[in-house]
Each structure stands twice: as structure tokens, then as C-alpha cells.
A protein has these predicted regions:
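Nucleic-acid endonuclease domains
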Residues: 1-133
Length: 133
């Protein structure tokens, strides 16, 4: 796992996940591009990387390992509120996601499906990342 301090940009997004994905895309490519919603099986969010942040959806259902196994990403980037990007392998990401995931349920209006999401960013999460970078 590696840690990289990213440069902030004036993002157009109010949604934190989209804002951080746009910042990550800028730091990876030098271009300001819109965040998009690609399927995990297609190739990742940017240059083969899956980009995540606090409260991001990890997968539908409860099987994180099966989701990561079917994911076409070459690596994973978790970007913190302080814009530190932690780049992880599939194995590291599985360990991280398993440790800091929480099971949520969509509203009945939206079908009531379960999904795994990252918890809010915490001191424990940041310490876990720093200890492994």
C-alpha cells in the first residue's frame, strides 16, 4: 500500500464521493473530468483504479470478497478527507473493506436491498491506513 498527498481542485460537486473522485481523477490524469458510474466489472473508475471514500458503497449484498473477485480494477484508491490517497491491491482492499464496512439497507421505496458501505472516516480507519502505508 502506498500513500500519496493529492492536490485539491475547485470541484463542482457537492456530493463528497463525487468530489473526491474528481480530485483523484485530476491527480491521476491532469484533467478535470466528471465523476461517472461505471460498473465494477468494466475497468474501474479511472485508469483501472476503483476510487472510494468514506460512506461509499462497496457492493450490493453482503459478499465483499465475491464482489472484489469479479471487479476488473487493477488496484483500489481510498481517498481521505485530507486528500491522502491510499492505493491498495485487491488483497489489501479486501482486508480494509472487511474491517471498515457496515451493512445498510435501502429504503422500501428503493427496493429495500442490502449493501455494504464504508463507515464514516474515523481515527481508527486513518490509523489502520497509516500503519500499512
Amino acid at each position: 500500500m502506498t500513500a500519496t498527498q493529492y492536490t485539491n481542485i475547485n470541484s463542482e460537486y457537492k456530493n463528497n464521493g463525487q468530489r473526491l473522485e474528481q480530485i483523484a481523477r485530476f491527480n491521476l490524469t491532469g484533467e478535470i473530468a466528471k465523476a461517472d458510474n461505471r460498473k465494477a466489472t468494466e475497468c474501474g473508475d479511472c485508469l483501472g483504479y476503483q476510487i472510494k471514500s468514506a460512506r461509499a458503497t462497496i457492493c450490493k449484498g453482503e459478499n465483499i470478497a465475491a464482489h472484489i473477485e469479479s471487479d476488473a480494477a487493477i488496484a483500489y484508491i481510498y481517498i481521505t478527507a485530507e486528500l491522502v490517497a491510499y492505493t491498495m491491491s485487491k488483497a489489501e482492499y479486501l482486508e480494509f473493506a472487511t474491517e471498515f464496512a457496515t451493512l445498510t439497507r435501502e429504503s422500501a421505496k428503493n427496493g429495500g436491498a442490502t449493501k455494504m458501505r464504508f463507515k464514516s472516516e474515523s481515527r481508527a480507519m486513518l490509523e489502520w491506513l497509516k500503519a500499512r502505508a
